Amino acid sequence: MALKELRIGTRASQLALWQANWVKSELEKRYPDMTVTLTKIKTIGDKILDVPLAQVGGKGLFVKEIEEAMLRGEIDIAVHSMKDVPTEFPEGLGLYCITEREDPRDAVISNGVKFADLPQGARIGTSALRRQAQLLKVRPDLEMVIIRGNVQTRMDKLKTEGLDAVILAAAGLNRLGFADQITEMLPTDLSLPAIGQGALGIECNLSNQDVKDAISFFNSPDTSRAVRAERALLWRCEGGCQVPIAAFGEVTGDQLKLTGFIASVDGKVSVKGVVTGPADDCEKLGVKLAEQLLSEGGHAILAEVYQREVSREKEIPV
């Protein structure tokens, strides 16, 4: 049965609305008779802007309230930045589509100065412990300044906070038309992306076949396999915003190459690895690499990181 209406739930940030409106536009092009509406929902991650995400604690900081609206039957689908999506879902809900990936790399915005040329002790604004750890690993002299807010707000902090550079996801900058502000793209061997970075995920009630049929065209098989491998690694490591974990999957033909990274927040201790195998075994490859990283020092790193989190108690996977 063809759907007459589809209700999209989204955060209200500039980037989230761009993403949700893109999904809305694609649906309207494909189904001219369908009425597609947006519902803006404020998440806890949007409400708490004066504290680093690592200190807020918990998972799903940018999705929980949206999922609750779906469970109440107020929306049919949710559009998320994949890097915000936890590896576990409320009963009945799930990730049904992962869109083709935008540029997954991190970007430097500065006053025209490339990363390698930043002065000794340069102040770098970032919202991610993952970036902080990787950049400190190669430049321990840098001063990392945690910045929060939407893309424009974080870009503005280059001036308002007296920063030498800010590091942001290239995908968001490209989507919002800020590509001309980028000084340099960081190669993935220097700054491995966040899990799912650059891809969008569409979540729905998995029992609603009509909705699943309507949105299935959004799924990119190659991006989906790459991101599912990354997410399997994260799931095995039980990571969230509080831990510097990064992974990047690349599909070529029927093969998948997955690179993973776990580090201490200061970047002084880290472990990195690579696995390759059939792309159809994406989740098995993610777990395999996670177990390799954990056995080669990742377990001790995570134990140390979690030990410092007085607000959380968890068992570190062995």
UniProtKB/Swiss-Prot annotation:
- Tell me where the transmembrane regions lie: none
For this protein, the record's InterPro entries field holds: HemC, Porphobilin_deaminase_cofac_BS, Porphobilin_deaminase_N, Porphobilinogen_deaminase_C, Porphobilinogen_deaminase_C_sf
Q: Name the coenzymes or cofactors required.
A: dipyrromethane
Cofactor: binding comment? Binds 1 dipyrromethane group covalently.
S-(dipyrrolylmethanemethyl)cysteine-modified residues are 241
Listed PROSITE patterns: PORPHOBILINOGEN_DEAM
Q: Which UniProt keywords apply?
A: Porphyrin biosynthesis, Transferase
Quote the record's miscellaneous comment: The porphobilinogen subunits are added to the dipyrromethane group.
What does the function comment of this entry state? Answer: Tetrapolymerization of the monopyrrole PBG into the hydroxymethylbilane pre-uroporphyrinogen in several discrete steps.
Instruction: Write down what this protein is called.
Output: Porphobilinogen deaminase
Organism (species): Citrifermentans bemidjiense (strain ATCC BAA-1014 / DSM 16622 / JCM 12645 / Bem) (Geobacter bemidjiensis)
